[in-house]
């Protein structure tokens, strides 16, 4: 159970692919102009990570070490092609919006990295969980950045959600404030870089505060009974 918890925590927070490893920045910065696009690409990446980790882990004993990377890439490309066809069939609007970034998941360092670092060494169940956790960590980072950029740039949230989730999702669209013209800085790549920088700074501050609290708690536990540590 502790190993399962560690895999989940590492994927979602401690070893977050976007905020710690800084992998997959090209789609992270290019696609997150809206929360809907960010959610769509994040879920596609999560599905690819989960399925490829599961497949590679299952086949790890039959994969020659000398040609493992080409085999990994072929497996990843097959899964990405299947996911691309699913999005094309059931969410065509999102498919048009994401464009080239769906097939580019094949070259995403996150997917190949987890295959080499985790799936090739661990069992199928734990590898699938690792892929799901890493994918959801990236999805959360994308959605936060996409939401911030959409709110600041257009004053809306989940605009076009029906392209991803169907016609019922039109009710998810929220107009936070009305604007006659979008704030282009937030919608263009410079805004993405600024937003990502703020998210990195925020995570650092949270980690430092949590570290300080753990240190203070450990110091209090180390004191003899009745002492508070105050002079």
Swiss-Prot record:
Disulfide linkage: none
Main location: membrane
Cellular component annotations (GO), alphabetically ordered: plasma membrane
Localization (cell): Cell inner membrane
Membrane topology: Multi-pass membrane protein
EC number: 7.-.-.-
InterPro entries: NqrDE/RnfAE, RnfE
Keywords, comma-separated and alphabetical: Cell inner membrane, Cell membrane, Electron transport, Membrane, Translocase, Transmembrane, Transmembrane helix, Transport
Record keyword Transport present: yes
HAMAP family xref list: RsxE_RnfE
Role, per record: Part of a membrane-bound complex that couples electron transfer with translocation of ions across the membrane. Required to maintain the reduced state of SoxR.
Name of the protein in its database record: Ion-translocating oxidoreductase complex subunit E
Species whose genome carries this gene: Escherichia coli (strain SMS-3-5 / SECEC)
């Amino acid at each position: 159970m502790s190993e399962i918890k560690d895999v989940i925590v590492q994927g979602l927070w401690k070893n977050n692919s976007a905020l710690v490893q800084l992998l997959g920045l090209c789609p992270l910065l290019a696609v997150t102009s809206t929360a809907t696009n960010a959610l769509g690409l994040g879920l596609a990446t999560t599905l690819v990570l989960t399925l490829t980790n599961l497949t590679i882990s299952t086949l790890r004993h039959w994969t020659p070490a000398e040609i493992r990377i080409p085999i990994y890439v072929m497996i990843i490309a097959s899964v990405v092609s299947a996911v691309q066809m699913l999005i094309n069939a059931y969410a065509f609007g999102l498919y048009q919006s994401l464009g080239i970034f769906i097939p580019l998941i094949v070259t995403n360092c996150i997917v190949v990295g987890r295959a080499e670092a985790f799936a090739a060494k661990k069992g199928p169940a734990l590898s699938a969980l690792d892929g799901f956790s890493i994918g959801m960590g990236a999805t959360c980072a994308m959605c936060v950045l996409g939401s911030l950029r959409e709110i600041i740039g257009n004053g809306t949230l989940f605009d076009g959600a029906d392209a991803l989730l169907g016609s019922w999702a039109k009710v998810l669209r929220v107009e936070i404030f009305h604007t006659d013209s979008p704030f282009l800085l937030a919608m263009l790549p410079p805004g993405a870089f600024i937003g990502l920088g703020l998210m990195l700074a925020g995570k650092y501050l949270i980690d430092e505060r949590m570290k300080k609290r753990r240190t203070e708690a450990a110091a209090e536990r180390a004191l003899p009974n009745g002492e508070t540590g105050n002079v």
